[in-house]
């Protein structure tokens, strides 16, 4: 759980922004969204595998683009 200490004479908006940023870094909102509905283990594995395939394709695409640009 992210904890921030509100500094003296610090506006509420600034403290709230710091808290939101710390929550984002901790991944709390992403975790809440992921756990909002039950996901069957097979669906979770399928989604993770699809993400891995997408990452690999993106990596290969970047490498091929780099090779094309270098003459």
UniProtKB/Swiss-Prot annotation:
Keyword terms: Ribonucleoprotein, Ribosomal protein
A Pfam short name: Ribosomal_S21
InterPro entries: Ribosomal_bS21 (IPR001911), Ribosomal_bS21_CS (IPR018278), Ribosomal_bS21_sf (IPR038380)
Transmembrane segments: none
Keyword Ribonucleoprotein applies: yes
UniProt GO molecular function: structural constituent of ribosome
Gene Ontology BP terms: translation
Keyword check for ATP-binding: no
Lineage: superkingdom: Bacteria
One annotated Gene Ontology cellular component of this protein: ribonucleoprotein complex
PANTHER family, per the entry: MITOCHONDRIAL 28S RIBOSOMAL PROTEIN S21 (PTHR21109), SMALL RIBOSOMAL SUBUNIT PROTEIN BS21 (PTHR21109:SF22)
Family matches, as NCBIfam families: S21p
Family: Belongs to the bacterial ribosomal protein bS21 family.
Protein name, entry field: Small ribosomal subunit protein bS21
Underlying gene: rpsU
